[in-house]
Swiss-Prot record:
Protein name: Adenylosuccinate synthetase
SMART domains xref list: Adenylsucc_synt
Job description of the protein: Plays an important role in the de novo pathway of purine nucleotide biosynthesis. Catalyzes the first committed step in the biosynthesis of AMP from IMP.
Positions that bind IMP: D13, E14, G15, K16, N38, A39, G40, H41, T128, R142, Q223, T238, R302
Species whose genome carries this gene: Parasynechococcus marenigrum (strain WH8102)
Name of encoding gene: purA
PANTHER family in the record: ADENYLOSUCCINATE SYNTHETASE
Sites where the protein binds substrate: T298, T299, T300, G301, R302, R303, R304
Positions bound to Mg(2+): D13, G40
Biological process (GO), any one: 'de novo' AMP biosynthetic process
Cofactor binding annotation: Binds 1 Mg(2+) ion per subunit.
Length: 437
C-alpha cells in the first residue's frame, strides 16, 4: 500500500492529468485536494479527448473511488456538465464522491472576479475569471456557501441572505453590474444540490476509511508549485495551495499518511497569464514549441507562454514539495531542435544566484544563465523503453535529474497513454527511480 501525492513542479499545465491517469490504474482512491474550475486536464482515451476541470482523472477506472476534497471550490454547474459529458461517453460515474464541506462558487463570485480583474487594468493578475479567488476569499471570511448547504433550503436561505446582499451592493455601486435575484439563485442552486446529493460524503471519514483498509490513495493537485498562494510568484498566483502540503489540508489527512510525492514537469516551461518568466522565448522558437506542444489552456483556451526548462524553479519545487521523483512530459516536443537550452542559475544585479527570489519584482529582473545541450533531431514518439531513446535525449534527461537533484521515474512522449516510459512504478516499486545522474 502506498499513498502518493502528484503535484505540478512549474506553473501548471505540466501534464498532471496524463500522469494521474497512468497512476490511477494502481490507485483505489483518487483525491482532488484543492483548486476549482480554473484548472483543467486533458486525457486521451481510445482516440477520445476528454477535458475535465473538477473531476479527477481516475473516473475513467470503474473500480476507482474519485473524491473531490474539502480544499476544493466547486462550481456545480460545471461539475454537472462534466458528469453529463462522461455519461455521454459511457463512463461509469458511480465512484464519484464530493466532500460535503467543499465550498461552492456562486454566480456573484464569477461576476466579481471578472469585474475586479477589469478594474485592475495594467495591474491585472491574469485570472481565469471563473470566480475562484472570490470563493476562497469568502471561505477565509467565513461567509461562504458549502456543498452541504445546497441540500437544505432553509439552511441555504440563511447562509445566502447576508453574503448576497453584500455582493449585490458591491456589484451595483462599485462595478456597475446588475444585482442578482435571491430567489433565482436559490432555486438554481437547490436544483444543483438535488442532482449532486447522491455523491456527497464526509471527506475525512471517506479517506480514513480507505486508509484503514490499506487502500492505495492518490492525491491529485491542480495548477503548479509556482502558482501556490504562499510559495509561488505572488501576486501572480492562485488562491489555494497546490504544493504537496496542501494535500494534507485539502483532504484532511496528516503528513504521516503520505508515502511519496511525485512532481510533474514539462521538458520545457510554460506559463499562462501574467507574471515574471525568466526563460520565456519569443519568435520562431516560441511558435514552434506552442504548435508542437499544443500549448493552449484547457480552461481558457489562452495561448501559453513558452520558454526553456528552468532548473532554478525546478530545484525550488523539489524543496518545497519534498519530491521523491519526477515525471517529465512532452519530451517529444523538443524532437526537432538542434540545440536545447536549460537555465541553471539567474543573474540578478550582477550577481549569480541559484535560488528562487521571493519578490516578484526581483524575479522580473532575473536574467537566465543557460547551458546548451545538443538536440537529437529525430522522433521519440514511438519509444517505449529507455534504451529506445536517442543518446542525446537520454543525456538531456540525466542533465535535468542532476540539476534538480531528483530521479526521473516517468517520461511522457505524447498525449496517448501508451506513449509513456515508466522507469520505476512510483506506487508499487521501491522508493527510488532508475534514471538519475
Amino acid at each position: 500500500m502506498a499513498n502518493v501525492v502528484v503535484i505540478g513542479a512549474q506553473w501548471g499545465d505540466e501534464g498532471k492529468g496524463k500522469i494521474t491517469d497512468l497512476l490511477s490504474r494502481s490507485a483505489d482512491v483518487v483525491v482532488r485536494y484543492q483548486g476549482g474550475v480554473n484548472a483543467g486536464h486533458t486525457i486521451v482515451v481510445d482516440d477520445r479527448v476528454l477535458k475535465l476541470h473538477l473531476i479527477p482523472s481516475g473516473i475513467l477506472y470503474p473500480e476507482t473511488i474519485c473524491l473531490i476534497g474539502s480544499g476544493t471550490v466547486v462550481d456545480p454547474k460545471v461539475m454537472l456538465g462534466e458528469l453529463d459529458m462522461l455519461i455521454a461517453n459511457d463512463i461509469d460515474i458511480s465512484g464519484l464522491q464530493l466532500a460535503s464541506t467543499a465550498h461552492v462558487t456562486m454566480p456573484y463570485h464569477r461576476l466579481l472576479d471578472l469585474a475586479m480583474e477589469k478594474q485592475r487594468g495594467d495591474r491585472r493578475i491574469g485570472t481565469t475569471g471563473r470566480g475562484i479567488g472570490p470563493t476562497y476569499a469568502d471561505k477565509s471570511q467565513r461567509s461562504g456557501i458549502r456543498v452541504i448547504d445546497l441540500l437544505d433550503e432553509a439552511r441555504l436561505r440563511e447562509r445566502l441572505e447576508g453574503p448576497l446582499q453584500e455582493k449585490n451592493q458591491l456589484l451595483e455601486t462599485i462595478y456597475g453590474v446588475e444585482p442578482l435575484d435571491a430567489e433565482t439563485v436559490i432555486k438554481e442552486y437547490l436544483g444543483y444540490g438535488k442532482r449532486l446529493a447522491p455523491h456527497v460524503v464526509e471527506c475525512t471519514q471517506a479517506i480514513h476509511q480507505a486508509a484503514r483498509a490499506r487502500k492505495n490513495i492518490l492525491f491529485e493537485g491542480a495548477q503548479g508549485t509556482l502558482l501556490d498562494l504562499d510559495h509561488g510568484t505572488y501576486p501572480y498566483v492562485t488562491s489555494s495551495n497546490p504544493v504537496s502540503g496542501g494535500a494534507c489540508i485539502g483532504a484532511g489527512v496528516g503528513p504521516t499518511l503520505i508515502d511519496r510525492v511525485i512532481g510533474v514537469a514539462k521538458a520545457y516551461t510554460t506559463r499562462v497569464g501574467e507574471g515574471p518568466f525568466p526563460t520565456e522565448l519569443s519568435g520562431r522558437l516560441n511558435d514552434q514549441l506552442t504548435e508542437r506542444g499544443g500549448e493552449f489552456g484547457t480552461t481558457t483556451g489562452r495561448r501559453r507562454r513558452c520558454g526553456w526548462f528552468d532548473g532554478v524553479i525546478g530545484r525550488y519545487a523539489v524543496q518545497v514539495n519534498g519530491l521523491d521523483c519526477l515525471a517529465v512530459t512532452k519530451l517529444d516536443v523538443l524532437d526537432e531542435l538542434d540545440a536545447i537550452q536549460v537555465c541553471v542559475a539567474y543573474e540578478l544585479d550582477g550577481e549569480r544566484i541559484e535560488h528562487f527570489p521571493s519578490s516578484a519584482e526581483d524575479f522580473a529582473r532575473c536574467n537566465p544563465l543557460f547551458e546548451t545541450l545538443p538536440g537529437w533531431q529525430c522522433s521519440t514518439e514511438d519509444c517505449r523503453k529507455l534504451e529506445d531513446l536517442p543518446d542525446a535525449a537520454m543525456a538531456y534527461l540525466r542533465f535535468l535529474a542532476d540539476l534538480m537533484e531528483v530521479p526521473i521515474a516517468i517520461v511522457s512522449l505524447g498525449a496517448s497513454r501508451d506513449q509513456t516510459i515508466v522507469v520505476e512504478d512510483p506506487i508499487h516499486g521501491p522508493k527510488r527511480a532508475l534514471l538519475s545522474a
